[in-house]
């Protein structure tokens, strides 16, 4: 059993339907499988919805290894647009991560990369979400 490292992952998000809306999702967790967690986030579509004043972050990923309650300690938005009755679907613009075995995080150890969702991935996700919510989100 490996010793877990403290990891911080920052995901810069852009609203698919409003390019002016940008948010930064910060996830702090203890895991010795940072590369798996990073890969999972890189393949993820992130949906946010606000219910009763609480912002829920829903991560859907095609990876076999997903962030789960066992390793995610804290997940919060440092900037978050006001959500009304619905939610927002985000694409990941940039992801940075940092991991230290001694528990101290240093911005100098960040690794950055960017991605863009394909149209087919987005359509598939919208169909899943439409089914989940009970109404059609596709334009």
Swiss-Prot record:
Database matches in InterPro entries: Pneumo_NS1
Protein name from the UniProt record: Non-structural protein 1
Gene (name only): 1C
Residue ranges annotated as motif DLNP: 136-139
GO cellular-component term (any): host cell mitochondrion
Effect the entry attributes to changing residue 133 to A: Decreased viral RNA replication and loss of inhibition of IFN-beta production
Annotated GO biological process: symbiont-mediated perturbation of host apoptosis; symbiont-mediated suppression of host adaptive immune response; symbiont-mediated suppression of host cytoplasmic pattern recognition receptor signaling pathway via inhibition of IRF3 activity; symbiont-mediated suppression of host cytoplasmic pattern recognition receptor signaling pathway via inhibition of IRF7 activity; symbiont-mediated suppression of host cytoplasmic pattern recognition receptor signaling pathway via inhibition of MAVS activity; symbiont-mediated suppression of host cytoplasmic pattern recognition receptor signaling pathway via inhibition of RIG-I activity; symbiont-mediated suppression of host cytoplasmic pattern recognition receptor signaling pathway via inhibition of TBK1 activity; symbiont-mediated suppression of host JAK-STAT cascade via inhibition of STAT2 activity
Free-text comment about domains: N-terminus is important for IKBKE/IKK-epsilon reduction. The DNLP motif has IFN suppressive functions like binding to host MAP1B.
Keywords assigned by UniProt, alphabetized: Host cytoplasm, Host mitochondrion, Host nucleus, Host-virus interaction, Inhibition of host adaptive immune response by virus, Inhibition of host innate immune response by virus, Inhibition of host interferon signaling pathway by virus, Inhibition of host IRF3 by virus, Inhibition of host IRF7 by virus, Inhibition of host MAVS by virus, Inhibition of host RIG-I by virus, Inhibition of host RLR pathway by virus, Inhibition of host STAT2 by virus, Inhibition of host TBK1 by virus, Inhibition of host TLR pathway by virus, Interferon antiviral system evasion, Modulation of host cell apoptosis by virus, Viral immunoevasion
Subunit structure: Monomer. Homomultimer. Heteromultimer with NS2. Interacts with the matrix protein M. Interacts with host ELOC and CUL2; this interaction allows NS1 to form an active E3 ligase with ELOC and CUL2. Interacts with host IRF3; this interaction leads to the disrupted association of IRF3 with CREBBP and thus reduced binding of IRF3 to the IFN-beta promoter. Interacts with host MAVS; this interaction prevents MAVS binding to RIGI and inhibits signaling pathway leading to interferon production. Interacts with host MAP1B/microtubule-associated protein 1B.
Function: Plays a major role in antagonizing the type I IFN-mediated antiviral response by degrading or inhibiting multiple cellular factors required for either IFN induction or response pathways. Acts cooperatively with NS2 to repress activation and nuclear translocation of host IFN-regulatory factor IRF3. Also disrupts the association of IRF3 with CREBBP. Interacts with host mitochondrial-associated membrane (MAM) MAVS and prevents the interaction with RIGI. Interacts with TRIM25 to suppress TRIM25-mediated RIGI ubiquitination and thereby RIGI-MAVS interaction.
Protein family (similarity comment): Belongs to the pneumovirus non-structural protein 1 family.
Compartments where located: Host cytoplasm; Host mitochondrion; Host nucleus
Name of one Pfam family that matches: Pneumo_NS1
């Amino acid at each position: 059993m490996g010793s877990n490292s403290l990891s911080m992952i920052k995901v810069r998000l852009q609203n698919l339907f409003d390019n002016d809306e940008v948010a930064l999702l910060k996830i702090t967790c203890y895991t010795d499988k940072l590369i798996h967690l990073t890969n999972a986030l890189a393949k993820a579509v992130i949906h946010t919805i606000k219910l009763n004043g609480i912002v829920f972050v829903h991560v859907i990923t095609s990876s076999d290894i997903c962030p789960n309650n066992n390793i995610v300690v804290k997940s919060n938005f440092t900037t978050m647009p006001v959500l009304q009755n619905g939610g927002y679907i985000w694409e990941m613009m940039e992801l940075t991560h940092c991991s230290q075995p001694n528990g101290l995080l240093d911005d100098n150890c960040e690794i950055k990369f960017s991605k863009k969702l394909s149209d087919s991935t987005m359509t598939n996700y919208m169909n899943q979400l439409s089914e989940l919510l009970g109404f059609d989100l596709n334009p």
